[in-house]
Amino acid sequence: MKLVIPGGTGQIGSVVARAFGKEGHEVVVLGRTPDAARAARTPRPMQGVARIVAWDGATLGEWAREVDGADVVLNLAGRSVNCRYGPTNRAAMVDSRVRSTRLVGEAIARAARPPRVWLQASTATIYAHRYDAPNDEATGILGGGEPGSPEKWDFSIEVAKAWERTLAEAATPRTRKVALRSAMTMSPDRGGIFDTLLALVRRGLGGTSGDGRQYVSWIHERDFVRALHWLIEHDDVDGAVNVAAPGPLPNAEFMRELRKAWGAPIGLPASEWMLAIGAVLMRTETELILKSRRVVPGRLLAGGFTFEFGEWSAAARDLCDAWRRESRERRGA
């Protein structure tokens, strides 16, 4: 199988490329030239990649030849949300997602042998900030203007809606389209979300964030890859699919289980005002920590998909073990 991954030079692309490449599939990553060059110099994260092809995410070029004849396209392109939401970054987040998605659709539409499935990154952030009930694809409430949610959080939701709308508008009648409403994908890769959270725990700072009631949705890297395989194989599934473990849990419990898995006896909590100051210093937004994302994988479960890591406690132990193992390997290299 040939898998093409536009925007695949980041953490998620690395996770997918390693897994699919190890299975013997041909993995081609499309990346902006600086990203592609950096990834090429870092062999561990980009294991499994047959080749990295340059693209600008804005214009058709030689990269489109890779799409023609591919079996699957997994579009991960988009400016990172881990930044301050000023006017420049807001425009970049919207433009990079909408423009690249439209471009991928154009390449697929022009292909003589289009891929049979287009897996398009979206986000679980599209759902409302809520504590009372989980959001699945059938009954979940899309966010925007809900009580208790800061108005500035609406921006991320509108970005996600524009992303999915662009996918829906793409005229690719010979290619099945799936929007991946993904939760945070946890892997031991350095610089990823798990590595960031674990760094807090290792420094004694991994306590409750805010009041700790906000739900954290997540998925282990192995289940993320397995879910992609399942979606590729099930020709009857299209549209939005929640790619998240079935066990979201409040932040206080989430961090407690992570501390337990690492063996950290304490973790200092962070109030909302402390998080606000930290977000400014780290050039990010508190929404990434304080929004309640209670998302469950309704369609995956209904279709018979089984999770290797359905509960965070087991996933946290496995990820901590993997992080330690990789640290030892790097020291011994």
Language-model features and meaning:
Residues 46-103:
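NAD(P)H-binding glycine-rich loop region in Rossmannoid oxidoreductase-like domains
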Residues 231-283, 317-318, 323-333:
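Mid/C-terminal beta-alpha module of Rossmann-like enzyme folds, strongest
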Residues 3-23:
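N-terminal Rossmann NAD(P)H-binding glycine-rich loop of SDR-like oxidoreductase domains
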Residues 287-333:
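C-terminal amphipathic/interface module of NAD(P)-dependent oxidoreductases
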Residues 161, 173-175, 186-196, 231-241:
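Glycine/proline-rich active-site loop of Rossmann-fold NAD(P)-dependent oxidoreductases
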Residues 198-207, 213-249:
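Alpha-helical substrate-binding/gating segment
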Residues 102-152:
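Conserved Rossmann-fold NAD(P)-dependent oxidoreductase catalytic core, especially the SDR/UDP-sugar
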Residues 147-177:
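Active-site Tyr-X1-5-Lys
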